[in-house]
Amino acid sequence: MKEFRTLALGEIRLPAGQSPVILRARHSREICDGCALYQSDPNRLTPVKPMMKLLSAIATTFALCCGLSSAAPKRPNILFILLDDQSPYDLKCYNPQSPLETPHIDSLAREGMVFDGAYHMGSFSGAVCTPSRHMIMTGRGVWHLPISPEAKQKELCPLDIAQQTIPALFNRAGYATMRTCKQGKSYEAANKLFTVRHDATKRGGTAETGSAWHGDRVMDYLAQRETRKDTQPFLIYYGFSHPHDVRDGTPELLAKYGAINHTDKSSPPAANPKQPKLPPNYLPAHSFNHGHPGLRDEVSVSGVWARRDERTIRNELGREFACSENVDIQIGRALAKLQAMGELENTIIFYTAGQGMAIGRHGLQGKQNLYQHTWRVPFIVKGPGVKPGSRVEGNIYLLDVLATLCDLANIPAPETNEGTSFKPVLTGEKQSIRDTLYGVYCGGSKPGMRSVRKGDWKLIQYDVMNGSIRETQPFNFKENPDELLAEHRAPVVVALTGAQPAGHQLNLAADPEHAAKLAEMEALLLAEMRRLDDPWRLWNQPDDGLTPPGQNSGR
């Protein structure tokens, strides 16, 4: 009976002048049949096959060993999932009380890392998604984009940087790149560089007109890779048109959330107990004109228009949840396919949205504000090296995605990149990559609104309507995480939401106890505006204009 002994490399000791021949086995390195066998005397190797077979085995082994020593580690696949308009508070991983059912997104959160501090930097346009998607593609800050108001200043905004965007970088690195997403409101020069591209705006309630269309494009692409036996790593930009309005859900999911695709502008939709409850920071109107009169998202969205009554808002939340669950179904299809192909374990998955959404919170409907429900975005990462069930602050911007994807794929980030890789957060080395966050919305009247956050404190300031409205809103999130205002204490509002704000849960601008903190936050905001080349100044700031851009601006 031949005796096989499994050995570690370097374990064999041979007489002088003899060398071991080692074949790679399924689970370990062995001296095996066809080369030589250890028998009872571990100091002597006894040939057991004819010389020709032995020489053949030696040659095969040598080639195999050489190939193994030079083989590069398998590069990760990347699945980047991007929704259009989703507040993090819709998801159970951010709001356990949410009735929205997204089992596949929930599983990504359980098996990956949830970011509590992920933000889009803001917008100078009512179409917030346009600069947001430019920032994702380019890794550049909001004031340094090719479409920025400062684009005429070439030193701030290089115009032709499509070749330094995600698809171009990954194409050159040998990745297969594929994209499906809504049509328009993004960086077209970059979008057309994906090797495979299927863009169309799909916000209907059928398989052909809704999110299943995007899902089918990804499923077809994966099936084709499987048929061709492709080994090239892939980057899939898996974008959805929902839950952006018009939120026409499928009949089954609308019924689940008690909603209808309401089209009668003259009356509110019918009440239904299945509809989601009003959020705790709901208001029937915003506290003041927030500076963008006639804004489409606030007055023209089908099913809502300018209404903020309970029935309208709860129905619209139900529609949004129906659309979001349909997106989750499509994500589940892709994950199952990757699992069946044996690719899931080597795939890094990012889940996020281009921006958040209000839908009744603070009396607003759209995405043109800087409250947490809209300035923040959901952000989940699952993949090799990411600790399951982990949660971090992160303090990332969407513009950090490019640098991070490059870092994870071992691709040098381009010189045009301004973002910071958060790979050290994903690997557990850090909890966050910055301590200060800046936000802007000035798509209406100028200078518009600005925000800054550091630690538990956040400041929003408004300078709108030709200076007729100037408001300051400092919040302490440790005490007031929902950014509740005095208006939230109104009995009619409390009766609708069931949420009774505590005495300290309000705008702290007039509180003398926090005057020093307010001054500190105002100074911090000005410093960020200067550092990031914000071209405007608020009423209480020096009119110093632009400062030269700093190295690695956007960090």
Predicted regions, residues:
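Extracytoplasmic
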Residues: 1-45
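Polar, surface-exposed loop/tail segments
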Residues: 102-103, 136, 182, 345-350, ...
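Active-site-proximal cap/lid insertion segments
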Residues: 83-99, 107, 123, 201-212, ...
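Loop/turn elements at helix/coil->beta-strand transitions in domains of secreted/extracellular proteins
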Residues: 74-79, 111-116, 172-178, 229-236, ...
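Catalytic-site neighborhoods of secreted/periplasmic enzymes
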Residues: 131-234, 246-254, 258, 429, ...
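Bacterial N-terminal signal peptides
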Residues: 56-67
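Short, structured active-site-proximal loop/turn typified by the sulfatase FGly-forming signature C/S-X-P-X-R
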Residues: 95-133, 139-140, 171-178, 262-275, ...
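Short, solvent-exposed turn/loop segments enriched in Gly/Ser/Thr/Pro and often Arg
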Residues: 94-98, 114-137, 179-190, 239-244, ...
